[in-house]
């Protein structure tokens, strides 16, 4: 019976972990307009990685994972706030410079 309970607990844990993350919408924000005024989209989550594209203020992105990794978020660039095609350029941005978009309004 104990082995059955452990197996059941393990199966329920795996089922919960298998849920898909659909992504959340964020917008580039908190940039210094007197500085470079762009957010670097990079090939990986580090400043040593190549810059793929420079994202300006108010650029919309969709996150690929629910949480940041060492402050970095993997994202897909959207063409507009209505673009949910997931077909945009993919890369990494520093999470401090993206703000969550509340879609409940």
Name every feature range the model reports, one short phrase each.
Residues 1-4:
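Positively charged n-region of N-terminal signal peptides that target proteins for export
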Residues 7-15:
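Bacterial N-terminal signal peptides
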Residues 16-20:
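Sec/Tat signal peptide C-region and signal peptidase I cleavage site
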Residues 21-36:
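Short N-terminal segments immediately surrounding and downstream of signal-peptide cleavage
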Residues 25-26, 45-46, 66-69:
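Short glycine/proline-centered loop/turn elements that form peptide/ligand docking sites
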Residues 36-46:
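Short, structured beta-strand/loop micro-motifs enriched in basic residues and often containing a Trp
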Residues 52-96:
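SH3/SH3-like beta-barrel superfamily modules
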Residues 93-105:
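Short, low-complexity, Pro/Ser/Thr/Gly-rich segments in the mature regions of secreted, periplasmic
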